[in-house]
Every structure is written in structure tokens, then in C-alpha cells.
Amino acid sequence: MFYAIILFILAGLAEIGGGYLVWLWLREAKPFWYGIIGGLILVLYGVIPTLQKFPSFGRVYAAYGGVFVILAVLWGWGIDKKVPDNYDWIGAVICLVGVSVMLWAPRN
């Protein structure tokens, strides 16, 4: 379980970090190399989920989506300095509950 959580966090940081660098390049006129580095990090994001031990692509990506929501809220708060409101936190917790059900529910 710890390994799965670490991989979800790494994938989220790669997706958000890479996307953020591309955003800075295209939306905030940062140098071209921001976009190149962002693109390379996004390629890494595409590889990380394949290291998960869960057998189903759909389940891994659906569960990762919930983790992504949490990380995006935290990124916005820490990097963009946009303080999440109560609804952001409630929605993020709901996503984590859903992820937990999807990944660790007892199945036959």
C-alpha cells in the first residue's frame, strides 16, 4: 500500500509540475526551456503509473485522479498562493474516500 501511495504522489507531482512549467512558458512568457523541461516531466508522468501493481489500467488511473485532486489543491495553495476554501477541502476528501474504496475494497 505504501508503494502505491508513493507512486501516486510521484505521478501527481510530475503531472502538475510538468504542466505548471508549460503553463508558465505559454501563459506567463517564461523562456522556451520551461516548456521543454515541462514536456519531459510530463513524459515521466506517463511512465510512473505503469509501475503500479494493480492489474487494471482503468482502476489505477481512476484512483490516481482522486490523488491528483488533492495534490492540485495543495499545489495551488503552496505554489500559486491561492488558499483553498472549505468546499475545496470537502471535495478533495470525498475524492480520497472514493480512491480508497476503489483500490482497497475487498474483492473476490
Curated annotation (Swiss-Prot):
Keyword annotations of the record: Cell membrane, Membrane, Transmembrane, Transmembrane helix
Top-level taxon? Bacteria
Where it sits in the cell: the answer is: Cell membrane
**Family annotation (SUPFAM superfamilies):** Multidrug resistance efflux transporter EmrE
Q: Which NCBIfam families match?
A: PRK02237.1
Name the HAMAP family on file. UPF0060 (MF_00010)
The family annotation for this protein states:
Belongs to the UPF0060 family.
Name the record gives this protein: UPF0060 membrane protein DSY4629
Name the species this protein comes from: Desulfitobacterium hafniense (strain Y51)
